[in-house]
Curated annotation (Swiss-Prot):
Part of the ribosomal stalk of the 50S ribosomal subunit. The N-terminus interacts with L11 and the large rRNA to form the base of the stalk. The C-terminus forms an elongated spine to which L12 dimers bind in a sequential fashion forming a multimeric L10(L12)X complex. This is Large ribosomal subunit protein uL10. One of its GO terms (molecular function) is large ribosomal subunit rRNA binding. Belongs to the universal ribosomal protein uL10 family. Forms part of the ribosomal stalk, playing a central role in the interaction of the ribosome with GTP-bound translation factors. NCBIfam families: PRK00099.1-1 (NF000955).
Length: 172
């Protein structure tokens, strides 16, 4: 990679760090090409990205971003996972690390907050934004459904009583 390509890559990576909701840094020593491709496809399907970058270039790209606190994590063979949704990158990375012990999560960042490996795992256990929206809609709909049942139940009971009374009068 010549200097112009490096500058372009650093600028692109800097933009990715600025736009991302969360960043996860991990060691990938020992992962096969197939496993790395699997990680990339899972992350892509979830709406995130995975990049392997030279540590020096990644450190330069982090300058001026909220995630600047994770500069110290870039030692050895590191891979960077990031996504706009704060939960996506940690969730996919942690799930993949459970299945492949060669991927070792070092830490990450969510906005200006620096996370250690346990922090990333805790973040991964939270529900995603879509899951939270679904729960909220369910919570809002439940009282309305109960109210509809409660208001229609007395009318149904009255109709049954009148129907029974009518049958009783017909039989008599």
């Amino acid at each position: 990679m010549d200097r112009a390509e490096k500058r372009e890559f650093v600028a692109w990576l800097n933009g990715a760090f600025k736009e991302s909701g969360s960043v996860v840094v991990a060691h990938y020593t020992g992962l096969t090409v197939a496993q790395m491709s699997d990680l990339r496809s899972k992350m892509r399907d979830a709406g995130g990205s995975v990049k392997v970058a030279k540590n020096r270039l990644a450190k330069i790209a982090l300058q001026g971003t909220e995630s600047e606190g994770i500069v110290d994590l870039f030692t050895g063979q590191t891979v960077v996972a990031y996504a706009n949704d704060p939960i996506t990158a940690p969730k996919v990375a942690v799930e993949f690390a459970k299945a492949n012990d060669k991927l070792v999560i070092l830490g990450g960042a969510m906005g200006a907050t620096t996370l250690n490996a346990d922090g990333v795992k805790s973040l991964a256990s939270l529900p995603s934004l879509d899951e939270l929206r679904a729960k909220l809609v369910g919570m809002i709909q439940t009282p309305a459904q109960r109210l509809a049942v409660l208001t229609s139940a007395p009318a149904g009971q009255i109709a049954r009583v009148i129907g029974a009374h009518a049958r009783k009068n017909e039989a008599a």
